[in-house]
Amino acid sequence: MVTIVLGAQFGDEGKGKITDLLSQSAALCCRAAGGHNAGHTIVHDNITYDFHILPSGLIAPDCVNLIGTGTVVHLPSFFKELDALKAKGLKDAHKRIFISDRAQVCFDLHSVVDGLEEASLAGKKVGTTGKGIGPCYSDKASRRGVRIGEVLEEGVVEDNLRKLEAGYRARFGELNYDLEEEIGRFNEYRTKLQPYVVDQMTFLEKYRSSPSILVEGANALMLDIDHGTYPYVTSSCTGVGGAIQGLTLNPTSIRSIIGVVKAYSTRVGSGPFPTEQNNAIGEKMQTIGREFGVTTGRRRRCGWLDMVMCRYSNSINHYTSINLTKLDILDDFDEIKVAVAYKLDGKRLESFPALPGVLDKVEVEYVTFPGWKSTTMGIIRWEDLPANAQRYIQFIEREMGGVPIKWIGTGPARTHMIEREV
């Protein structure tokens, strides 16, 4: 049976921690979409691990890991991450990671193009990670891309990469890019990559009857190419549909869909953010929460929890339970606000707006809660939480239509987690 972990907001919710926890009993952990633009941080045995393209399940010693067909894979990052895990003591990680031969290759060329495209937008920048994800998915959709399996075939990467480079040079002029260097590197990868490449359908067949397959979502629903705050989104399907498509999952095998919700809101890069706090409150959240991007190091914008957004996210992903994260970051706030509705021209909106211009203009209706003003760091039992923290959590559950909050994060370590019987 399959468990899917998905971000319910703008990303950076803390998906890696619940994935790490659940992967301890999982036979297989998979990434379905996205690339090395993702960033998941896990603290285990006082060691901090940063994941980008690799699934977080590699920390679990008995968990096999798969990078699925829906992903885009930057191979230098793939090998660099594997080496970093080995240096931190995960000596056998390279034996437990595989890549679908149908996944797309993300080249350094794509990163160069990403920067040029972003620069051309001037004052309307999307705020991408600059990792080349958008151009790579564009080449995939235009049927110009290279698949992982083709890296193993002599001459295929060189032929296709020369065509891609010529096309981008015709569009942008001279590029700050060494074509011959990248071709040479991929000639080396032809042998180096061989042990990791699998036919996904055949590979997954061995796990069809497994009681525990875990899917680790990347990014989040509000960055989904179809359902997010377009065009300020990533270039893949980040919701449950993307997981099913990218991993060829049987929908009837899905046992649970876990939505990961941060106890407040953050966003990296450009785009609408109705509950953003450009003030001392936002700065306090940013400082206490250490809100800097794992992938880019950029400062995250911060604001209050937005239940309008979370309800919209739930209506698309159909969460069976919620993991509420970083509750402890709110410990020192005198009062805590939660967005419950949007108004436009004095009227409550009945649905989540599709247009970013509308989101920029909405008036946010808040419910205000008294803070608990005591530490929740490291608490592992529900009954030990302050009463005001419990009320805050129960309100979120009601606003989510009764979807239970089963896990509550109270700190960075794996052990800093409350698991409720719900």
Curated annotation (Swiss-Prot):
State one molecular function term (GO).
Answer: GTP binding
Spell out the catalytic residues.
Answer: D12, H40
Kindly state what the record says about how the cofactor is bound. Answer: Binds 1 Mg(2+) ion per subunit.
Pfam families per the UniProt record, alphabetical: Adenylsucc_synt
**GO CC annotation:** cytoplasm
Cystine pairs annotated here are none
| Enzyme Commission number | 6.3.4.4
Role of this protein: Plays an important role in the de novo pathway and in the salvage pathway of purine nucleotide biosynthesis. Catalyzes the first committed step in the biosynthesis of AMP from IMP.
Name of this chain's protein: Adenylosuccinate synthetase
Q: Which organism is it from?
A: Ajellomyces capsulatus (strain NAm1 / WU24)
